[in-house]
Amino acid sequence: MMTLLRSFFVLTTFLFLSCNSSNEISKPNIVLFMVDDLGWQDTSVSFWKNETKFNRLYNTPNMEILANMGVKFTNAYATPVCSPSRISLMTGMNAAKHRVTNWTLNPNKKKPAEINHKIFEFPDWNYNGLSTLDSISNTIYATPLPQILKDNGYYTIHAGKAHLGAIGYPSSNPLNIGFDINIAGHAAGAPQSYLGVDNFGNNNSKNKIWAVPGLEKYHGKDIFLTQALSEEVLEKLQKPINSKSPFFLYFSLYNVHAPLMEDNRFVEKYKNIGLKNSEIKYASMVESMDHALGVVLKELENKDVLKNTIVVFMSDNGGLSAVAREGEKHNHNYPLKSGKGSIYEGGIRVPMIVYSPFHKTNIREINHPVIIDDFFPSILEFTKCEESSFVQNIDGQSFVPLLNNETVEKKPLFWHYPNWWGPIGPGIGSYSAVRQGKWKFIYFHDTQIIELYNLEKDISENNNLISVNTSKSQLLANVLTKYLKSVDAQMPYNKITNSIVPWPDEHPLFN
């Protein structure tokens, strides 16, 4: 398959360059492959200057194929937890602006870790998720990406994890935000079970909230959730392929989110190299995810539509490391520090690959920093829907020019998490941060600690330069504060000081 796809990519590129001026292809297909909790190095594709031990451990041949066909983004970012990333994807808004700053599930309710917190009273964030109406409390009113694409003639398919709105709210069902087809998406952000023999959790009446819906025909079968989703995707793709309609496939896998479970198709090799139990399960889930990617790529190739299809691969946050894993906690994303839930690089830097047969570039790697907010305007540019109207003001900046090797200004990237995740570990808490160029500034709300890192020299964030480079620290504190104020960002209330947490530029170091 790898040889076929590489040859096809060369041929497709040649044909495109020879006919691009005629603009024969007006509406490319879009496949957005979103993985849950996949770490930056949880793949045999390296996104760093050096190969790591994790690149040598995991087996992701189809990611390798996609990377060889397309372009790797080595400085790609999401938010530290899942729902904020997914809302940013659907709206083009930064989490500080859309205020779905933590993961959603229960309606009209903050997260358990936020209730009765000893230090903070957390803001009344948008825990009910996305809304297409402006009258629903604690939601972000926005025009969703799939609705725009549908309105522009796209057949829209959602498969897998949705996690866009609380239980009972319209956005918990992808059909209500512009998808024509919804395969197994609902309010919950994880499955009760990945196993068909467990009916994907539908046997457990106590935890029905997590049970995966809509896959009844696979109940009782020895099939992993990822395989069932892949089979459903292949079936649903036939309609737009046969009718030659442009399509948007949002394949949003539940993998590799906990609960960690073995995919028996891929488990033996990891047992044979001496991994511990949970790591065997995790590695098999990584390979299971990759196999699903390969299934889709092969189908697009076999049906002769890959030549008119843009494929984007992304993870919704950094790799899990604080819980559920064996080995040293907060070390599963080395050389990055910490993991999911953290503002350190292990919690927010993620693997990203873009394959587009329509952009003239010989580069295989892009180091320009991009963030999940950027996907909305990029996909609209890919699909020539730039002029579409939407109600929200977006933060994202299209990364499409980068695929043409054009110079793009390095805008600041912002993170804002005025919430509490639950697990403890380095960089996990309540915080705001900004990256501008090689510099990253972090402001922890609970401790009032500030940190500055030069990521080009210190990717592991071991050397805090806050006292060495006060001028750069103050500059970034000002940039961060100006942005947070401009979007009316929420801040926690400190019960100890009886006051709202100060803005970053109000830190004593700068005053």
Provide a role label for each language-model segment.
Residues 224, 228-241, 268-309, 326:
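A long, amphipathic alpha-helix that forms part
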Residues 181, 319-345, 360-364, 368, ...:
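C-terminal cap/loop subdomain of S1 sulfatases and analogous C-terminal strand-loop tails that border
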Residues 54-60, 74-81, 107, 113, ...:
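A short beta-strand-to-alpha-helix junction
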Residues 32-33, 40-143, 148, 202-203, ...:
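Active-site segment of extracytoplasmic enzymes that catalyze sulfate/phosphate-ester chemistry
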Residues 23-28, 35, 40, 72, ...:
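Long, internal low-complexity/basic segments
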Residues 170-178, 259-262, 298-359, 371:
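Histidine-centered active-site microenvironments of extracellular/periplasmic hydrolases
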Residues 105-155, 162-245, 253-262, 283:
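Formylglycine-dependent
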Residues 30, 36, 161, 233, ...:
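A short aromatic-rich beta-strand->coil structural motif
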